[in-house]
C-alpha cells in the first residue's frame, strides 16, 4: 500500500508551523520580559542622576540597606541550617502525617505577610515568649530575622526537597556499600547532586527575605529595613521620596542573583 507524498503546499505549511511557533514564543517571551523591565526603567529615570545619587547615599537609606542585607543574610543562613535537614528528611521518609507537615511548611507561602506577622507577634511579643526573656524579640534586628525566616525559609525547604527527590536513593545505598556511613553518603553523594536546587532555594530565600515587609512591619518596625523605609518615605513625603530607596532594594536583589551567577553556580542552568 503506497502512501501519498505531500504536495508542495503541504510541505510549505509543515515548514511554516515551526517558524510560526518560534515567532509566537519569542513574541510572548519578549512581552513578559518587557513587562519586567519597564517598571525598573521607570524607577531609574524617575529622578535626575544627581538627585538620585544624593538620595541613595542618604544616611537613612544606607542604614536601612545595611539592616536589610545583614538581616536577610542571617535569615538565609538560619533557613539553610534548619531547612536543608528538614527538606532531606521529608524527601527520604514516608509516614502518616507527612502531608500535614508539608502543608505546615508551605503555610507561610500562602498566608498574607501581615497575618504571619500577627502570629509571630502573638508568639514572641510581650504577651508571649517576650515576657520570659530579657532578649528583645520584637523591635530589634532579632525580630527582623524572625519575621524574614518565617516567610522566606519555605522557599528553601521546597526547592531543596525537590532537589533531593531528584537524587536516586540507590546512589546513597551504593556509597554505603563502599564503606560510607549515612552522613558520609549524604555529604559526598546527595548534597553535591542536589547542590543546584539548594542554591536556587538560597537565592529565592534571600530575595524573599530582603523584600519582606508585612511580617517585619508587625514584628520589628525598628530597626527599619528597606521595605519599611520605602513605606515610611512614601507616607511622609510621597512617591518621589520612596523611589531612591526602592532603587537600592532592586539593586541589592539583582546584585545577589548576579553574584550567584558570577560564582559559576547559576542554579537555573
Curated annotation (Swiss-Prot):
What does a knockout show?
A: Mutation causes nitrate respiration deficiency.
Give me the segments passing through the membrane.
26-46, 69-89, 100-120, 140-160, 198-218, 243-263
In which compartments does the protein localize?
A: Cell membrane
> Which PROSITE patterns does the protein's record reference?
ABC_TM1
Q: What is this entry's stated membrane topology? A: Multi-pass membrane protein
Q: What Gene Ontology cellular-component terms does the record carry?
A: plasma membrane
Name the major location: membrane
Q: Which residues form the ABC transmembrane type-1 domain?
A: 65-258
| Any one Gene Ontology BP term | transmembrane transport
User: Does the keyword Nucleus feature in the UniProt annotation?
Assistant: no
Q: Which UniProt keywords apply?
A: Cell membrane, Membrane, Molybdenum, Plasmid, Transmembrane, Transmembrane helix, Transport
Q: Which InterPro entries match?
A: MetI-like, MetI-like_sf
What SUPFAM superfamilies does the entry give? MetI-like
> What role is this protein assigned?
Part of an ABC transporter complex involved in molybdenum import. Responsible for the translocation of the substrate across the membrane.
Q: How does it assemble?
A: The complex is composed of two ATP-binding proteins, two transmembrane proteins (HVO_B0370) and a solute-binding protein (HVO_B0369).
Family classification: Belongs to the binding-protein-dependent transport system permease family.
Q: What is this protein called?
A: Probable molybdenum ABC transporter permease protein HVO_B0370
Tell me what organism the protein belongs to.
Haloferax volcanii (strain ATCC 29605 / DSM 3757 / JCM 8879 / NBRC 14742 / NCIMB 2012 / VKM B-1768 / DS2) (Halobacterium volcanii)
